[in-house]
């Protein structure tokens, strides 16, 4: 996950080109198709921007870009911080230039990459609640 996040965030650095975003392996799952219909129109007041892919499972907002991807494998239990936002469990990881938040207990998973400019990063997660809630639950929750 960290290597994938690093590749994604490198596409965010300092230019106005569309961010380079890799499409997750399960992006075409029916659950991600449903989740993509619930992506927010804006995040932190920032509108949707183009990315390097036209996959509906990938969306970005603003500059620097907040990036969301649906179609990752569900996370295994972890000692990383886990928060519940509007009934959705999220695992938080600190990155060199921001944070990632990945749904926990959803299959497939959504990952949201949030640049430091939007700190504190968890405050952006309510915008992704409807998309995350569209994913099937595995029954696992933050503890």
Regions found by a protein language model. Give the residues of each.
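Bacterial N-terminal signal peptides that target proteins for export
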Residues: 1-5
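Mature extracytoplasmic domains of secretory-pathway proteins
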Residues: 45, 50, 55-102
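Bacterial signal peptide processing site
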Residues: 15-19
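Post-signal peptide N-terminal segment of mature Sec-exported envelope proteins
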Residues: 23-46
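C-terminal motif of bacterial Sec signal peptides marking the signal peptidase cleavage site
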Residues: 10-14
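Secreted/processed peptides and extracellular or luminal domains of membrane proteins
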Residues: 21, 38-39, 76, 88
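Extracytosolic low-complexity repeat regions of secreted or lipid-anchored proteins
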Residues: 79-143
């Amino acid at each position: 996950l960290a290597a994938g996040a690093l590749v994604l965030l490198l596409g965010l650095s300092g230019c106005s080109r569309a961010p380079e975003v890799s499409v997750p392996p399960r992006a075409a799952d029916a659950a991600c198709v449903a989740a993509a219909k619930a992506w927010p129109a804006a995040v932190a007041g920032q509108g949707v921007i183009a990315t390097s892919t036209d996959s509906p499972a990938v969306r970005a907002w603003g500059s620097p870009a907040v990036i969301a991807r649906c179609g990752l494998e569900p996370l295994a239990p972890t000692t990383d911080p886990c928060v519940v936002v509007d009934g959705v469990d999220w695992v938080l990881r600190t990155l060199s230039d921001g944070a990632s938040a990945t749904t926990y207990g959803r299959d497939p998973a959504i990952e949201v990459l949030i640049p430091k400019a939007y700190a504190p990063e968890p405050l952006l997660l309510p915008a992704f609640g409807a998309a995350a809630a569209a994913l099937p639950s595995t029954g696992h929750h933050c503890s």
